[in-house]
Amino acid sequence: MDARAAISELVVANRVVAQLKLVDSFGHVTVRNPENPQRFFMSRARAPGLVTKDDILEFDLNSTPVDLRGMRPYAERFIHGCLYKSRPDVMAVCHNHAHELLPMAVTKTVMRPALHSAAVIGHEVPVWDIRDHFGDGHRHD
C-alpha cells in the first residue's frame, strides 16, 4: 500500500466509524504512513463523518505537523504520536470519547476485566494519561 491508498482508506475509516456511531464528533482515526513509518496521517480537527482527502494532514512521531496548510489539527494528535512512537508494530489508531468510560476516568476508578475473554488484559485495564507525558495545562498547539 502506498501513501495515497492509506489516505483513501483513512477517509473511509473516518466515515465508517462515524456512520456506525463508534465515535462522536470528537473521535478520530489515524494511520501510519506506509512509505515513511516515522510519520502518520490524521484529519484536521473535523467531525469524522465529514472528512475528505483534502482534510488529511501528515505528522511526525512527535506529532509535529509536516504542513498544516492553514488547517487546525486535533490536540489529541499527541496520543496517536506517542502510540506510534512506542509501538512500531501499530499501523492505525482509533480514539474516541466513550461516554460509558468517562466517569471512571474522571474519578480515577480502576477498571477491571469482567469477562473471561478479557483475562489477557491482566488484573487492571491499563490507562494512558496524557498528563504523564505533557503535564497539566501545558498547551502544545
Language-model-derived ranges and their functions:
Residues 1-141:
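Glycine-rich flexible loops
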